């Protein structure tokens, strides 16, 4: 069975109530490719609003979640709180949280486990820095990040994961991995899934690409065998996000 193409829009810390509603209403009314799963991820303050405005075909994701169910964790949001708000997805492991907030592979893996066990699906982000790529360590880095998750998750739980490969050097920089570079890493990730998890996980897990995805480069990237969609940053705030969702039309 072919993997369902997946396009996520990560609004990051951008927008306000009005713009969030406008972006989602634009998606609601657009002629979107029906074979694509679309998920938007606004700032936490607008999650409830996004879920109320978005039609049922559009998923809504938190940009983060904590690994404890409740308690004295100022500023954090629990899995149960997100589920009560009818949020089905969360992004975890984004490079901005790895780099700026010093989140470790192990902490991200624990959060991934807590999210899945609590009923969320996870967009699990991995990727290398420019230094790591230039040192030919790309596969080592993404494998290390994946291995941390593999220690926490059962083989069955990978069915709740979408892997997002985002080379750090391409996020928000305008630099984009070539289609060949992206496909090479996606292929290596799929091989890792087969070797470390199962043949079924390798066949069914969606591996999406992020890093300066735009309406200009999405069609070529979408043609690659192991690229199952996109995690879009800045372009998800613009009308061109519709073109990215429709990359395969």
Swiss-Prot record:
CDD domains registered for this protein in UniProt: TIM
Which UniProt keywords are given for this protein, alphabetically ordered? Gluconeogenesis, Glycolysis, Isomerase
| GO annotation terms (biological process) | cellular response to farnesol; gluconeogenesis; glyceraldehyde-3-phosphate biosynthetic process; glycerol catabolic process; glycolytic process
Q: Which InterPro entries match?
A: Aldolase_TIM, TIM_sf, TrioseP_Isoase_bac/euk, Triosephosphate_isomerase, Triosephosphate_isomerase_AS
Protein origin, superkingdom: Eukaryota
Q: Does the keyword Isomerase apply?
A: yes
Which Enzyme Commission numbers does its entry carry?
5.3.1.1
Quaternary structure?
Answer: Homodimer.
Looking up HAMAP family in the UniProt record yields: TIM_B
Protein name per Swiss-Prot or TrEMBL: Triosephosphate isomerase
